[in-house]
Amino acid sequence: MKIILFLTLIVFTSCELYHYQECVRGTTVLLKEPCPSGTYEGNSPFHPLADNKFALTCTSTHFAFACADGTRHTYQLRARSVSPKLFIRQEEVQQELYSPLFLIVAALVFLILCFTIKRKTE
């Protein structure tokens, strides 16, 4: 029991937080700085912006920010190329328009409109 408490104490005192971001290769990623006076530790080009934000080019990279209070924020960017899966998802959305439920509701609305128009003409 003492060992478990000791290990949890070590984990909480190290204060290392991990952040994961997935992006499309070649685009720019906009992230928020974890602390305003942090020290950047990494080999990727870092572009500080207004409102405690920064921009990085999306490549598979690993970098960190060390804050003044001792907290370390580790970031992992995972670059992916555009895959055909994105286009498959769009086709699935278009097919949902012609689902059986939609067709049943459309047929009912059509029949109701036909009967109400027929009654008005009589």
Swiss-Prot record:
Virion surface topology ranges: 16-96
Disulfide bond positions: 23-58, 35-67
Domain notes per entry: The di-lysine motif confers endoplasmic reticulum localization for type I membrane proteins.
Domain X4e, first and last residues per copy: 16-81
Gene Ontology CC annotations of this record: host cell endoplasmic reticulum; host cell endoplasmic reticulum membrane; host cell endoplasmic reticulum-Golgi intermediate compartment membrane; host cell Golgi apparatus; host cell Golgi membrane; plasma membrane; virion membrane
Effect on the protein of changing residue 38 to A: In strain: Isolate Shanghai LY
InterPro entries assigned to the protein according to its UniProt record, in alphabetical order: ORF7a_SARS-CoV-like, ORF7a_SARS-CoV-like_X4e, ORF7a_sf_CoV
Positions of short motif Di-lysine motif: 118-122
Transmembrane segments: 97-117
Keyword field contains Signal: yes
Intravirion side: 118-122
Signal peptide: 1-15
Entry keyword set: Disulfide bond, G0/G1 host cell cycle checkpoint dysregulation by virus, Host endoplasmic reticulum, Host Golgi apparatus, Host membrane, Host-virus interaction, Inhibition of host innate immune response by virus, Inhibition of host tetherin by virus, Membrane, Modulation of host cell cycle by virus, Signal, Transmembrane, Transmembrane helix, Viral immunoevasion, Virion
Protein name: ORF7a protein
UniProt keyword annotation of Transmembrane present: yes
Subcellular location: Virion; Host endoplasmic reticulum membrane; Host endoplasmic reticulum-Golgi intermediate compartment membrane; Host Golgi apparatus membrane
Gene3D superfamilies: SARS coronavirus X4
The species this protein was found in: Severe acute respiratory syndrome coronavirus
GO biological process: symbiont-mediated activation of host apoptosis; symbiont-mediated perturbation of host cell cycle G0/G1 transition checkpoint; symbiont-mediated perturbation of host cell cycle progression; symbiont-mediated suppression of host innate immune response; symbiont-mediated-mediated suppression of host tetherin activity
Membrane-related topology note: Single-pass membrane protein; Single-pass type I membrane protein
Role according to the record: Plays a role as antagonist of host tetherin (BST2), disrupting its antiviral effect. Acts by binding to BST2 thereby interfering with its glycosylation. May suppress small interfering RNA (siRNA). May bind to host ITGAL, thereby playing a role in attachment or modulation of leukocytes.
SUBUNIT field: Interacts with the spike glycoprotein. Interacts with M protein. Interacts with E protein. Interacts with the ORF3a protein. Interacts with human SGT. Interacts with host ITGAL. Interacts with host BST2.
